[in-house]
């Protein structure tokens, strides 16, 4: 039997960059329809189209039993009063779980069942979040510095971004009077 070769890579805890990783960049223009204040979104895109987040992924073949891992650097910012966030997703194989480790900065994870039941878990360096099977999840930067975290997930989990792009999350995370507030999403579709 031919065994897969073990390997090690370096993670820079200051920058969130994993050596030899595949880099993906999401700009605000890549997130049309994700934020409530569409006018503020349009203005920010026209005035510079900021990078919202970067992902550095080490991926394996999509097969059962293997693991992928990735870091995300989620930049601080708001569209209107809604904090910068990742697109969010279910897993294509919805019965797959995931684990997130907060490394730097301040933020949180918004999780949701297919029926719209939602939870928000605050994250700071050292926080580990378990995402159970069947829960959609997105991370949100509620601070003023980059929020960096590491995710570990089954290589065959896949990403279903389409359901979130179409329906959204049932809750949004905004700043009101200097506080982080989780509110009902007026655009959410069951």
From Swiss-Prot:
Protein origin, superkingdom: Archaea
Ways its activity is controlled: Inhibited by mannose 6-phosphate, fructose 1-phosphate and fructose 1,6-bisphosphate. Its activity is also inhibited by Cobalt (II) ions < EDTA < nickel (II) ions < zinc (II) ions << cadmium (II) ions < copper (II) ions. Sodium and potassium ions and manganese ions show little or no effect on activity.
EC number: 5.3.1.9
Keyword Cytoplasm: yes
Effect of residue 91 to A: Loss of catalytic activity
Effect of residue 89 to A: Loss of catalytic activity
GO biological process, one term: gluconeogenesis
Keywords for the protein's UniProt record, in alphabetical order: Cytoplasm, Gluconeogenesis, Glycolysis, Iron, Isomerase, Metal-binding
The protein's annotated pathway: Carbohydrate degradation; glycolysis; D-glyceraldehyde 3-phosphate and glycerone phosphate from D-glucose: step 2/4
Pfam family membership, one: GPI
CDD domains noted in UniProt: cupin_PGI
GO terms for MF: glucose-6-phosphate isomerase activity; iron ion binding
Protein name: Glucose-6-phosphate isomerase
Organism: Thermococcus litoralis
Source lineage: Archaea, Methanobacteriati, Methanobacteriota, Thermococci, Thermococcales
Gene label: pgiA
